[in-house]
């Protein structure tokens, strides 16, 4: 089936056979897979004007298509002819997978195509290769006469055999009936143990005879009656071609089992001719050995010697017993001539195998050289075609350039003529245009005059009409503006009213807010003022009390001083009068408080004092050198002495039978007031008095040195000796003693009004048990500087201080922590939020928050608004008296 390519005019361009493809540099034609129309693909370099053809809707130049297709077709046909001629002259190589018969036929044609000199050269090369290999193998053999004669015999034998072999080949080549060259057999003869090389000892003759007998083949006349041994080869395939297995020089009537010799040759060929050379060496050794035996046998007895006859040696050889027994059973034996003939035939087959390889190699080289020459020729032809094509293309380009130049000249001439015609035409058109312009101007002037007249009339009418329209428009605009002004006025009034209402509402809200804040501020100020006023009144009262107490104390000290001087004079007089009286007895002098005084003023408090209070005899302290005291401590000692003199009744009153028992409460109050007056100078005027909530429990470690007698009935006063540690006194004498430096109590004050103990200013409350043991020296375990004296607490810090609640006026010793106040404020705000007590912005009154937060305080202590503000700073938004937690609940 063919397809054709046609041009537009229906002319057939080229035929395409089925599955045929033509390719050139510019065009490629091939069959489509399932399309009935021809397909083509072209890479078009240029497109010129001319006759076109359409192939699959692609415009192509007919000349280029035809040229490209014809060129591709010519190359394809030439390549096909060349391939056919090569196949006819030289059949395909063996590597192409041909059958053995085709392979032999190919080698046969090649051999016949060679000249006589080429054939002789191939045979000579083979002979030289065998001789060179034999020389290389015998290079290291011994140099004895036997080995020398053996080498010479081998060379002579090879010369003879190759000469005869070439004659046979030449005769076969010149004969009319050309038999096929022998090819390798499919079977291989197991002859690895038949031939052995190297220098042999005395058994060389027997081994060579054995090898010769094994390689010998009976003639055709005896082939049917004498079978070959089993170990000499394999049977040929019954289906094989007998002609393929015939070597050169064989007759058609020969036995088919002669292929075993071919197997021997194949085996020799696979070993690169090594075993063949060994076989030749054995033959030469055998010949030399026979010659020596003949020479030795002539002296002993006449023996009939036949060349290459070694039947007796074969029969005596133990290794060849099986082969000899088979031939002895048949009753036939081979002569020496037959063995030599069989050896020559074996060599011919072996040489044919090796020569066939040489011929095959030469055939391959010849084919390769021919193909290379053909390729070079095709390359040269291609280059020639390319050069011709380039020349044609150059000529075509030159023609195109010349054509373009001619066309350009024609176009320039046409342009020049067109320009001249255009100038002439433009000139005529300009004259005609000028005439028409003048005519048009004249007509235009006439039209303008008429138009001006009409325009003046129309303008008058238009002006009157416009004035009327303007009047109507002004009236209409005035009405519209009046309506707009009226509407704007109403809107302005409404807006002003709305703004005024909003402003009033905002003002009312602001006023209410300001009033509320002002009320809260006034309330807070009132509370703060009340607090400040209360503090001021309390301070004034305390100042007055302190001033009054100071005046009274001054008067009291003056009076006591006078009384003391009197008492000293009286004591001195009594001491001189009663030197022999024991110290434990009462003094003879008596001091009686006047009955007109109901009590002694201590600290501004009037307390009743008994008129005649019996005083127990005072035990005198042992006369010991007293340490020097600092001025501060001396003042306290003087005050204690004044108190002792004041509380000690007059000696004259001891004899009075009337006994007055003072009230415990009044005596305790007097003692407290006296204690305050004694401690206040050391504390300074800025120290606030203890609040009403501060308990007065065991004020210790503050006692100045000195003993104070107890107020009670006679016989109930216990004397306590004063023991002052010398080291402690030295420590105190280094500087003024402050209340914080007095560390250890010297004694306790007893229950005022009852039987008490002698001691220093110490406990005001009655002790649980009276002091009955003597006062021990003060301990120096803790230094004075480590303790702080606090007269308002039960003890100073570092020993046994305990936090006690204070009052709001003088501050609290246990303030509420800030986190407790904040948490209580958050809980209170949440409660007020649930109750709806907050405004629209989430603020709540600080006073209400403070009152509610008092319930949520975990410590149970109260706090003020200022403490609430201080604790909630940063957690609450505080605006005036309003508070709100940041971030909400």
UniProtKB/Swiss-Prot annotation:
Biased composition annotated in UniProt, kind: Basic and acidic residues: 380-396, 409-577
Coiled-coil boundaries: 363-581
Residue spans of biased composition, Low complexity class: 218-229
Acidic residues: bias regions: 236-255, 295-320
One protein family per Pfam: NST1
Bias (Basic residues): 39-49, 397-408
GO CC annotation, single: cytoplasm
Region (Disordered): 31-51, 197-255, 291-339, 380-610, 648-701
The UniProt record lists the keyword Mitochondrion: no
Main location per the UniProt record: cytoplasm
Polar residues: compositionally biased ranges: 201-215, 593-604, 663-672
Subcellular location: Cytoplasm
Keyword Membrane: no
Key words, A-Z: Coiled coil, Cytoplasm, Stress response
Family note: Belongs to the NST1 family.
Its biological purpose: May act as a negative regulator of salt tolerance.
Protein name: Stress response protein NST1
Organism: Yarrowia lipolytica (strain CLIB 122 / E 150)
């Amino acid at each position: 089936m063919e397809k054709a390519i046609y041009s537009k005019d229906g002319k057939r361009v080229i035929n395409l056979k089925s599955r045929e493809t033509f390719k050139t540099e510019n065009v490629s034609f091939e069959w489509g897979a399932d399309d009935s129309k021809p397909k083509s693909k072209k890479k078009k370099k240029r497109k010129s004007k001319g006759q076109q053809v359409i192939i699959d809707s692609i415009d192509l130049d007919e000349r280029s298509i035809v040229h490209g297709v014809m060129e591709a077709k010519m190359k394809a046909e030439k390549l096909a002819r060349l391939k056919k001629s090569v196949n006819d002259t030289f059949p395909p190589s063996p590597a192409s997978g041909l059958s053995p018969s085709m392979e032999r036929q190919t080698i046969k044609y090649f051999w016949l195509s060679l000249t006589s000199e080429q054939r002789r050269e191939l045979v000579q090369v083979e002979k030289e290769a065998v001789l060179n290999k034999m020389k290389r193998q015998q290079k290291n053999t011994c140099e004895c006469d036997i080995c020398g004669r053996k080498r010479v015999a081998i060379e002579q034998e090879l010369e003879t055999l190759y000469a005869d072999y070439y004659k046979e080949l030449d005769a076969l080549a010149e004969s009319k009936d050309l038999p096929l060259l022998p090819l390798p057999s499919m079977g291989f003869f197991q002859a690895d143990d038949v031939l052995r090389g190297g220098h042999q000892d005395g058994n060389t003759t027997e081994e060579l005879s054995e090898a010769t007998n094994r390689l010998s083949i009976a003639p055709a006349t005896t082939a049917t009656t004498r079978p070959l041994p089993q170990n000499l080869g394999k049977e040929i395939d019954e289906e094989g071609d007998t002609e393929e297995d015939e070597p050169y020089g064989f007759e058609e009537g020969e036995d088919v089992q002669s292929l075993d010799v071919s197997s021997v040759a194949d085996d020799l060929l696979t070993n690169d001719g090594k075993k063949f050379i060994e076989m030749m060496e054995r033959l030469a050794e055998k010949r030399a050995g026979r010659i020596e035996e003949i020479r030795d046998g002539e002296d002993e007895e006449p023996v009939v010697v036949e060349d290459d006859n070694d039947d007796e040696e074969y029969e005596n050889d133990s290794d060849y017993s099986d082969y000899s027994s088979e031939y002895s059973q048949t009753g036939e034996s081979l002569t020496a001539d037959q063995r030599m003939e069989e050896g020559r035939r074996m060599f011919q087959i072996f040489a044919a195998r090796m020569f066939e390889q040489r011929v095959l190699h030469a055939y391959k080289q010849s084919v390769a050289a021919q193909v290379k020459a053909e390729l070079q020729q095709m390359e040269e032809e291609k280059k020639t075609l390319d050069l011709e094509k380039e020349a044609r293309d150059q000529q075509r380009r030159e023609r195109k350039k010349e054509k373009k130049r001619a066309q350009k000249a024609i176009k320039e001439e046409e342009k020049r003529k067109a320009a001249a015609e255009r100038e002439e035409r433009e000139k005529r058109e300009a004259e005609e245009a000028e005439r028409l312009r003048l005519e048009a101007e004249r007509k235009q002037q006439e039209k303008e005059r008429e138009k001006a007249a009409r325009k003046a009339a129309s303008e008058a009418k238009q002006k009157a009409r416009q004035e009327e329209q303007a009047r109507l428009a002004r009236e209409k605009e005035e009405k519209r503006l009046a309506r707009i002004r009226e509407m704007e006025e109403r809107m302005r009034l409404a807006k002003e009213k709305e703004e005024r209402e909003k402003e009033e509402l905002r003002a009312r809200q602001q006023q209410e807010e300001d009033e509320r804040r002002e009320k809260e501020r006034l309330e807070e100020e009132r509370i703060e003022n009340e607090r400040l006023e209360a503090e001021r009144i309390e301070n004034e009262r305390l100042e007055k009390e302190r001033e009054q107490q100071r005046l009274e104390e001054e008067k009291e000290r003056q009076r006591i001083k006078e009384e003391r001087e009197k008492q000293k004079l009286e004591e001195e007089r009594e001491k001189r009068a009663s030197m022999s009286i024991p110290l434990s007895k009462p003094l003879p002098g008596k001091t009686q408080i006047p009955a007109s005084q109901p009590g002694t003023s201590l600290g501004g408090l009037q307390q009743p004092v008994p008129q005649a209070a019996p005083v127990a005899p005072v035990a005198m302290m042992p006369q010991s050198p007293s340490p020097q005291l600092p001025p501060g401590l001396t003042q306290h000692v003087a005050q204690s002495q004044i108190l002792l003199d004041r509380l000690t009744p007059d000696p004259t009153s001891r004899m009075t039978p009337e006994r007055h028992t003072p009230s415990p409460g009044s005596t305790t109050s007097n003692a407290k007031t006296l204690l305050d007056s004694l401690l206040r100078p050391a504390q300074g005027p800025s120290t606030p008095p203890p609040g009403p909530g501060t308990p007065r429990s065991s004020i210790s470690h503050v006692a100045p040195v000195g003993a104070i007698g107890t107020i009670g009935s006679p016989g109930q006063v216990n004397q306590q000796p004063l023991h002052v540690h010398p080291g402690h006194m030295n420590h105190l004498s280094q500087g003024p003693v402050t209340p914080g430096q007095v560390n250890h109590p010297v004694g306790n004050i007893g229950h005022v009004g009852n039987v008490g103990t002698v001691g220093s200013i110490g406990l005001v409350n009655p002790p649980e048990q009276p002091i009955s043991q003597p006062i021990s020296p003060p301990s120096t375990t803790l230094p004075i500087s480590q303790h702080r004296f606090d007269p308002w607490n039960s003890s100073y810090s570092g020993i046994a201080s305990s936090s006690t609640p204070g009052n709001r006026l003088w501050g609290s010793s246990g303030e509420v922590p800030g986190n407790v106040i904040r948490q209580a404020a958050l809980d209170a705000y949440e409660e007020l939020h649930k109750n709806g007590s907050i405004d629209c912005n989430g603020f709540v009154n600080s006073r209400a928050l403070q009152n509610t937060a008092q319930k949520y305080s975990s410590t149970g202590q109260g706090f003020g608004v200022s403490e609430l503000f201080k604790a909630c700073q940063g957690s609450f938004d505080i605006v005036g008296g309003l508070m709100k937690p940041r971030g909400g609940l």
